[in-house]
């Protein structure tokens, strides 16, 4: 998904300046810079760069596909429970897997410097980039809001069933597809001499507007929402820490929140350079860069976006591991409190007084009970719920 400076498209293909100059009316299409395929002769430096990028992407593809398939198998095996985290992790792993499956087409285009997959390939592979990118960030936004609700408004999450969460996950894919449809319909295969290029049917202004819109829906909008949620969570945890210290209560473990935030930050770190590169090509076309430099930047941004999907499975494993430990601790604590005298009264009282007027300090008993109601019991052998 890394376009060249001159071509303003996305998935990854490395288009050179000469390719851009061939487009009608000087249209600076950054369409999958590499998807379109460069036309200038290959130098030794270009051959070495192509070989290195092909090897790196192939390695990323193998590692990422194995990791995400493993995640999907494990998550689907234990998806019988209504644990929200597992429903969303399945969606993230599926998006990563679909994105990684485009690597063979990218590598083939890099090596041959031509597009061999026809008009349907243009539409599917170009659209797949935007589809999976939006599905991932939308799912991460929902996960952040779920954790926010579980910490600050746990009673609101009790009524949310597994079916509700699956519907929400389906909605993220439908919204991502809706945002991707314009590219799917506009992209087409064009012959330029002996080369095949994937180009949009619309003009440069429409293309720039569309890419700017997608930057807003994939980076800016979700970033503002997630940032606001974590700022409020940080404030709530700080207030809760003060209250917990005074009342000698133990704070809920925030490791799950940290891991979700880590996945979000990794997404931004990998995709923000790609988007800045694309928008720079759209709004500042006269860049003092040689074709070789543009290709190298295109290669690096491509590796970053695929690297995100390659690293994510390891973070998903840590996330689910910490989530299971978190639930076990909550259930053990709840079980011991329920066995004590008057536990029912104290539980109901804690639910009523979950959010205190002094700044929403967290009630550990209420949160424990809510997590147990929302999630099925964790078996003693450590299986996923």
From Swiss-Prot:
Ranges of the Cytoplasmic topological domain: 77-86, 146-166, 232-257, 321-385
Protein location: Cell membrane
A Pfam family: 7tm_1
Regions of this protein lying in the Extracellular compartment: 1-53, 113-123, 186-208, 284-298
Gene Ontology terms for molecular function: urotensin II receptor activity
CDD domains: 7tmA_UII-R
Keywords of the record: Cell membrane, Disulfide bond, G-protein coupled receptor, Glycoprotein, Membrane, Receptor, Transducer, Transmembrane, Transmembrane helix
Mode of membrane association: Multi-pass membrane protein
Biological process annotations from GO: blood vessel diameter maintenance; regulation of blood pressure
Glycan-modified residues: 28, 32
PROSITE patterns: G_PROTEIN_RECEP_F1_1, G_PROTEIN_RECEP_F1_2
Coiled-coil segments: none
Top-rank taxon, per record: Eukaryota
PANTHER family associated with the record: G-PROTEIN COUPLED RECEPTOR (PTHR24230), UROTENSIN-2 RECEPTOR (PTHR24230:SF60)
Family: Belongs to the G-protein coupled receptor 1 family.
Protein name from the UniProt record: Urotensin-2 receptor
Species this chain originates from: Mus musculus (Mouse)
Gene: Uts2r
């Amino acid at each position: 998904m890394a376009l060249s400076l001159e071509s303003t498209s996305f998935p990854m293909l490395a288009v050179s300046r000469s390719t851009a100059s061939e487009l009608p009316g000087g249209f600076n299409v950054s369409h999958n810079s590499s998807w379109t395929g460069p036309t200038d002769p290959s130098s030794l430096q270009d051959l070495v760069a192509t070989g290195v990028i092909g090897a790196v992407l192939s390695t990323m593809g193998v590692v990422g596909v194995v990791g995400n398939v493993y995640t999907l198998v494990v998550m689907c095996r234990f998806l019988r429970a209504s644990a929200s985290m597992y429903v969303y992790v399945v969606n993230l792993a599926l998006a990563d897997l679909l994105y990684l499956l485009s690597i063979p087409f990218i590598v083939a285009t890099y090596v041959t410097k031509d597009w061999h997959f026809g008009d349907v390939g243009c539409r599917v592979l170009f659209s797949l980039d935007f589809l999976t990118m939006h599905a991932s960030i939308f799912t991460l936004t929902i996960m952040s809001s779920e954790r926010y609700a579980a910490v600050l408004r746990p009673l609101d999450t009790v009524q949310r069933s597994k079916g509700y969460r699956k519907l929400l996950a389906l909605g993220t894919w439908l919204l991502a597809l809706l945002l991707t449809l314009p590219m799917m319909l506009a992209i087409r295969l064009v012959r330029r001499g002996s080369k095949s290029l994937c180009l949009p049917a619309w003009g440069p202004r429409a293309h720039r507007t569309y890419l700017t819109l997608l930057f807003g829906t994939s980076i800016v909008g979700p970033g503002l929402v997630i940032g606001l949620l974590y700022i409020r969570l940080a404030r709530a945890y700080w207030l809760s820490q003060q209250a917990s210290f005074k009342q000698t209560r133990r704070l809920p473990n925030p490791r799950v929140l940290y891991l979700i935030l880590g996945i979000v930050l990794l997404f931004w770190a990998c995709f923000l350079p790609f988007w800045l590169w694309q928008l720079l090509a759209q709004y500042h076309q006269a860049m003092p860069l040689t074709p070789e430099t543009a290709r190298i930047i295109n290669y690096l941004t491509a590796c970053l976006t695929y690297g995100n999907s390659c690293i994510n499975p390891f973070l998903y494993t840590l996330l689910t591991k910490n989530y299971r430990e978190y639930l076990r601790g909550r259930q053990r604590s709840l079980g011991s409190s329920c066995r004590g005298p008057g536990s029912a009264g104290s539980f109901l009282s804690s639910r009523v007084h979950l959010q205190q007027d002094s700044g929403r300090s967290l009630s550990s008993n209420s949160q424990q009970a809510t997590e147990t109601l929302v999630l099925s019991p964790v078996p003693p052998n450590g299986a996923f719920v």
